[in-house]
């Protein structure tokens, strides 16, 4: 499934909002309108049992503990009928791509299902999954959150020896 520009822009806006504001500065977003895809996603977030935060319309994040990463920030961006879930594994400033690290990431990519490892337009190493509305159920939604978190944690473990410090 190819990511649309609007969905990528929504995810980028969510990431940027974390960098430029503190939680106290962020106004509370409006609740989703009943019957919308946004309301459906919020319902699935509530059913997941995870604490989540709405950044703006169609944009949320949640924090999960990891084994390799102390905390995994799962970022969610919804389009009209699909949702992307992702996590920044290593920001550009700490990313050191070598032939060896790339080979290890490609092998991990082969092992993973329903999630991809990629470098985004900001040159950060990320993992992400995308789901269309017709594939979504509360169970599939929560499962995808766990798959993304697990993939991010595994990718970070592989990249740890290759990290640079800013």
Describe each model-derived feature in a short phrase.
Residues 1-5:
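Positively charged n-region of N-terminal signal peptides that target proteins for export
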């Amino acid at each position: 499934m190819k990511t649309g520009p609007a969905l990528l822009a929504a995810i980028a806006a969510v990431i940027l909002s974390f960098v430029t504001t503190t939680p106290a500065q962020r106004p509370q977003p409006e609740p989703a309108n009943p019957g919308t895809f946004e309301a459906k996603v919020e319902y699935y977030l509530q059913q997941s049992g995870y604490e989540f935060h709405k950044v703006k319309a169609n944009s949320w994040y949640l924090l999960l503990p990891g084994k390799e990463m102390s905390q995994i920030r799962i970022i969610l961006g919804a389009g009209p009928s699909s949702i992307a879930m992702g996590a920044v594994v290593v920001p550009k400033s700490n990313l050191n791509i070598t032939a060896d690290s790339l080979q290890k990431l490609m092998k991990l990519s082969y092992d993973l299902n329903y999630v991809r490892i990629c470098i985004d337009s900001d040159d950060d190493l990320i993992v992400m999954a995308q789901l269309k509305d017709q594939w979504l159920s509360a169970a599939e939604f929560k499962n995808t959150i766990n798959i993304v978190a697990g993939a991010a944690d595994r990718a970070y473990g592989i990249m740890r020896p290759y990290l640079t410090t800013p």
